[in-house]
């Protein structure tokens, strides 16, 4: 069965939660701010959401899942992986079954936002490769495909056992 969900930030107020419920939504994907993913904060959010019959079905935090220190194997990588593992452990303690992961050292790269050829009148992120190719390298050099895969394997070797122990699945975005 398909479960329709909406994304929200961990700082969403009651009016937003009520709005989701009025739309008939039951399931929420929560993006946690850095200071909102300790056990007590997550539990409080779950209790507040339960008042609106809403349930967190998956969670992420940009600071731990879009982390160039991890993705590029930079100094401090192991400490950042430990943070991801703490996040995963808390989600498991709170019975949140899925943690998000995006392997994008530079995030989603866009040139600008505007109405484009295929956006049907809506504003969208536009990629202009000519403009992007003129940019300075974001991390000082080009990383090889092999380096990126090696860093991904390094990450998985250190996080999947924690996910399994916590009862949490990792969803790659």
Positions of PLM-derived features:
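Active-site acidic/histidine proton-transfer and metal-coordination neighborhood
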Residues: 71-172
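Mobile, glycine- and charge-enriched loop segments
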Residues: 1-10, 45-51, 68-69
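N-terminal small/glycine-rich loop or linker at the start of catalytic domains
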Residues: 1-2, 55-71, 131-140
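Short, acidic/polar
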Residues: 9-22, 41-45, 79-89
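Hydrophobic faces of well-ordered beta-strands that scaffold small-molecule active sites
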Residues: 2-7, 26-30, 56-61, 99-101, ...
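Conserved, mostly hydrophobic/aromatic
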Residues: 20, 28, 49, 91, ...
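N-terminal substrate-binding region of glycoside hydrolase catalytic domains
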Residues: 22-40, 60-75
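Acidic-and-aromatic substrate-binding clefts and catalytic sites of carbohydrate-active enzymes
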Residues: 6-15, 31-44, 106-109
């Amino acid at each position: 069965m398909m479960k329709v969900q909406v994304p929200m930030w961990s700082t969403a107020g009651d009016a937003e939660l009520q709005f989701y419920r009025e739309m008939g939504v039951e399931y929420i994907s929560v993006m946690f701010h850095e200071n909102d993913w300790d056990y007590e904060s997550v539990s409080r959010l779950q209790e507040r959401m339960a008042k609106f019959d809403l349930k967190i079905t998956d969670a992420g935090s940009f600071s731990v899942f879009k982390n160039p220190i991890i993705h590029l194997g930079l100094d401090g990588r192991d400490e950042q992986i430990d943070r991801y593992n703490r996040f995963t452990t808390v989600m498991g303690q709170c019975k949140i079954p899925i943690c998000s992961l995006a392997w994008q050292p530079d995030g989603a790269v866009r040139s600008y936002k505007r109405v484009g050829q295929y956006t049907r009148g809506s504003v969208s992120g536009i990629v202009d490769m000519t403009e992007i190719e003129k940019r300075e390298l974001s991390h000082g050099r080009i990383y090889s495909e092999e380096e990126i895969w090696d860093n991904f394997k390094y990450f998985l070797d250190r996080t999947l056992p924690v996910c399994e122990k916590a009862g949490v699945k990792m969803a790659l975005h």
